[in-house]
């Protein structure tokens, strides 16, 4: 009778050990899920910050591009005016309208 009682106790201890192991695994899984949720929140915040920063960068870069485009246009206009003045002077000197 003791052998069957001892075997029953061993079986109960084995089951309790298995239950404890499953409990530990489930606790670890819950901790991992909570950590993952925190990481996702952190990632979401970083994504929102990056989106705001990218919008600011986009508008700033467009303003800078527009500014330099106008600078180039002004420079081209100035060069064209200078070339035109030189051509007019050359033509006037060549035709004798302006005496040398």
Curated annotation (Swiss-Prot):
An example of a Gene Ontology BP annotation on this entry? regulation of endocytosis
Keywords noted in UniProt = Antiviral defense, Autophagy, Cell membrane, Coiled coil, Cytoplasmic vesicle, Endosome, Lysosome, Membrane, Phosphoprotein, Protein transport, Transmembrane, Transmembrane helix, Transport
Residues flagged as site, Binding to STX8:
32
What is the tissue specificity? Expressed (at protein level) at a high level in kidney, lung and spleen; at a lower level in testis, liver, brain and heart. Expressed in kidney and retinal pigment epithelium derived cell line.
Q: Which Pfam families match?
A: Synaptobrevin (PF00957)
Which cysteines bridge via disulfide bonds? Answer: none
Its name, as the record gives it, is Vesicle-associated membrane protein 8
Membrane-spanning residues where?
A: 75-95
Which SUPFAM superfamilies would you find in this protein's record?
SNARE fusion complex
Name the major location.
membrane
- Looking at the UniProt record for this protein, which Gene Ontology cellular component terms does it annotate, in alphabetical order? azurophil granule membrane; basal part of cell; basolateral part of cell; basolateral plasma membrane; cell surface; cytoplasm; cytosol; early endosome membrane
């Amino acid at each position: 009778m003791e052998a069957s009682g001892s075997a029953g106790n061993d079986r109960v201890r084995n089951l309790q050990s298995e239950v404890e192991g499953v409990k530990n695994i489930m606790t670890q899984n819950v901790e991992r899920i909570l950590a993952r949720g925190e990481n996702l929140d952190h990632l979401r915040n970083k994504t929102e910050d990056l989106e705001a920063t990218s919008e600011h960068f986009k508008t700033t870069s467009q303003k800078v591009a527009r500014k330099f485009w106008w600078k180039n246009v002004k420079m081209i206009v100035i060069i064209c005016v200078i070339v035109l003045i030189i051509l007019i002077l050359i033509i006037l000197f060549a035709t004798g309208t302006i005496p040398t």
